[in-house]
Amino acid sequence: MKITSAIAFLTVAATVCAEELPRKAKGPRESYPNADVIYDSVTAPDGKRLRAIITKPHETKAKLPVIFLTGWLSCDSVEAPADTKDTIGLILRGLAQTPGFCLFKIDKPGCGDSEGDCSQTDFNTELAGYRAAFRALKNYEFIDSSQIYIFGSSNGGGFASLVPETDAEQAQVRGYITIGGWVKTWFEHMLDIERRRFALMKKAPGEVTDSIKGATTLYYEWLINGRSVSEILKEKPELADVWPEGKDQAHLYGRPLKFYQDLQKLNLAAAWSRVKVPALILHGQYDWIMGREDSELIAQYVNANAPGSARFVEVPEMGHGGQHYLSMADAFAGKQAPFDPKIIRTMTDWLEQQQRKPAG
């Protein structure tokens, strides 16, 4: 890093977090031949420090637009070292090397170097961290915080439009990209994914319906009535077979039960209906986790508010997180084909197209 870049880094670090966040990861940091990487931190409202990883093109002199990541549900880090084999990591590395753009990522509490415990963090706490990071963008002298593109992956593709709270913050956003997002209630999503899961498990059609009846009771009591899964299963032990986590009745997909009760209280349809900027809404042909209809609805809601602003794209042979599969059965089994980098080009072409348009 050159002296001028080092001075800029120290200035930014002082404005965002007064004390350097210790590194927990044992692997190499991110690095790129054509981009600088800054490891910083943002302090969330509850006082926990969250790792921020920012990339910017070498020799940047003017302020640049920024791609701001709203991440997935799982407790996986956003860090994407050069040797990553993770598909979303490969996509993020592609975005980090896009000429003319910065990339801003944070690790949620307890992920990567961030303080906290991901397995005990509810969604409202996680969202507050993203909002703090969004507001910190103005502290970086190389970022044009009036030109923010929010990229939401999976769960982040659902709640992306909740990050900018005020009218002024919404005016800072130039566009959205989502991959495998959602917009229905979480209760509806759980019934959708369970129906697909049971079918892909090769249950007979009648068995799928019986299992969905049980899942409907279980998820209604948990998500809508606010009861614990252990309490429900103690009362109705016959529902135990439909609970995806087996004996762990306090977590789902590594997150606490309250995380999903928070999601159930959201109104994402209302949030996306307020969006007035361009949106690229992507869904994989072989995404069995998030349904195609959710992504179509996001595009529909944006277009109802700003006709022609949103574009829905069904990406052939793509899975939930950008993976390349040859069939839905392969996607369910996790049997990946070699990564197809065309998804990166789809995103960067769209970003460059938006930048050629006049702001506002």
Region spans (language model):
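Alpha/beta-hydrolase active-site loop
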Residues: Q120-Y140
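Short, surface-exposed "cap/lid" segments of acyl-processing enzymes
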Residues: E59-L95
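Accessory cap/linker subdomain of secreted extracellular hydrolases
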Residues: I177-S273
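Short beta-strand/loop motif that positions the catalytic acidic residue
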Residues: V275, I281-H283, D287
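Catalytic active-site module of serine/aspartate enzymes centered on a nucleophile-bearing elbow/loop
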Residues: M318-G321, L326-G360
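Conserved alpha/beta-hydrolase "acid-adjacent" motif
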Residues: W288-D294
